């Protein structure tokens, strides 16, 4: 997907500001590619490593704890000027923070019920539709159709359907949230300086998730659990944000968008390595279809 549209991931790991295409050196591009891969790996392996926390505290509790740590750490670094923002700025971060909290909770609820690779592929349909329709490319609906076929292949292992209806619905909800997140981050990124928009939206997300997450997690908290969650908050979303921000300064946004299309494949790989979620050849082909559809939509959007 093109970075002009995808300015945030499942966990807010991407930049909140649009970046123009650049023509950096070959060495800079290579470093940017490495940073993109590292960012996607952080996001997907971070999601896989979150499985024990989701089981211990529930999806709402895991979301709340991670947002509290991430928002607190970033607020200390950025020091947003809370009292100086206008009404329109507040409305923007309130909307973005609410969407972020709901999106993350929905995604965690999905991966608690269905394989990670399937959840990521379904969720990816949201930004894929934005990339297809956002540039007026109604004729390019072929790409979302390809991706949907890929999702169907992922959902069937040759013997039975691997997902359940609640998990699939949560993944669809996360995808819808991601699509809204993309549209909102463009507005918030333009309304704030530097990282203030990201910091404020994470603070709002932490507050929004508190009524649900605190009740789910508070009675189960341990010292080791807090350290584990703090580490995961660094892994997602803070480290991916930094990696992607630096990567975008070293490579064209079109190349960045194509690379980020690999995220469903990395999600499936993380599920296999961390969660022992194997894939059949047809499921691998389904993942390839989703990735190919994303790359195709990115290329046509860049041309359009």
Report residues per predicted region.
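Glycine-/small-residue-enriched transmembrane alpha-helix faces in small-molecule transporters
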Residues: 1-61, 95-98, 102-106, 149, ...
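Hydrophobic transmembrane alpha-helices of multi-pass small-molecule transport proteins
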Residues: 6, 98, 125, 139-158, ...
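Hydrophobic alpha-helical transmembrane segments of multi-pass integral membrane proteins
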Residues: 31-35, 61-76, 140-146, 166-173, ...
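A helix-boundary/kink motif common to multi-pass secondary transporters
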Residues: 58-59, 115, 193-194, 252-253, ...
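C-terminal transmembrane-helix exit sites in multi-pass transporters
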Residues: 73-82, 124-145, 265-285
